[in-house]
Amino acid sequence: MTRLEIVDSKLRQAKKTEEYFNAIRTNIQFSGKENKILAITSVREGEGKSTASTSLALSLAQAGFKTLLIDADTRNSVMSGTFKATGTIKGLTNYLSGNADLGDIICETNVPRLMVVPSGKVPPNPTALLQNAYFNKMIEAIKNIFDYIIIDTPPIGLVVDAAIIANACDGFILVTQAGRIKRNYVEKAKEQMEQSGSKFLGIILNKVNESVATYGDYGNYGKRDRKRK
């Protein structure tokens, strides 16, 4: 089995928001045991959904859950900069096009209990690939193997892929960048995703200016109190 290693800079970045995503993980657990296959999307690109997907998957794995992170943003994957391969890898598009077995695309990582399915090469027909029988076949095959499956999807405000993926998921989460996207666009994205039949689990407000709002700044909680003593 091919091994992927999360690069040090990304691991350090995830460490800074560890408590924030631990809180999100806890909220997901409280939302119901049935919510184990989750699609993560955003309105536009660059809002941090891939980073959020990775951080959430890390939090779940570090909490003791066997977790699979699937990079389904096959049009514009950024996870190749997060996980580096120790050898030649095949990814999701290889499997969906019938050029790889499921076992060929699930990669171990240097994080215990975390496995990853890379996106693979950019296909000429991303939406059509997701709509073929292989995607649902994959979900059926792995859903009882892992405690949680986190799927990073393309932005729903740009392409319909995220809604197609969400149709096979228990729920979805919207990631939005603070101060960038108007509320009506976020609401429209939520409605588009809900049309898939998937359950809306919440919004992750990303890239918050901490000089303006420090809510969620869990990393400093307790440190200020210790300094006062």
From Swiss-Prot:
Autophosphorylated. Pfam families: AAA_31. Pathway: Capsule biogenesis; capsule polysaccharide biosynthesis. Transmembrane segments: none annotated. It comes from the Bacteria. Dephosphorylated and activated by CpsB. It catalyses: L-tyrosyl-[protein] + ATP = O-phospho-L-tyrosyl-[protein] + ADP + H(+). GO terms for biological process: capsule polysaccharide biosynthetic process. One of its GO terms (molecular function) is ATP binding. Keywords: ATP-binding, Capsule biogenesis/degradation, Exopolysaccharide synthesis, Kinase, Nucleotide-binding, Phosphoprotein, Transferase, Tyrosine-protein kinase. InterPro entries: AAA_dom, Bact_polysacc_biosynth/exp, P-loop_NTPase, Wzc-like_C. One of its GO terms (cellular component) is plasma membrane. Its EC number is 2.7.10.2. Involved in the regulation of capsular polysaccharide biosynthesis. Autophosphorylation of CpsD attenuates its activity and reduces the level of encapsulation. May be part of a complex that directs the coordinated polymerization and export to the cell surface of the capsular polysaccharide. Belongs to the CpsD/CapB family. This is Tyrosine-protein kinase CpsD. It comes from Streptococcus agalactiae serotype V (strain ATCC BAA-611 / 2603 V/R). The gene is cpsD.
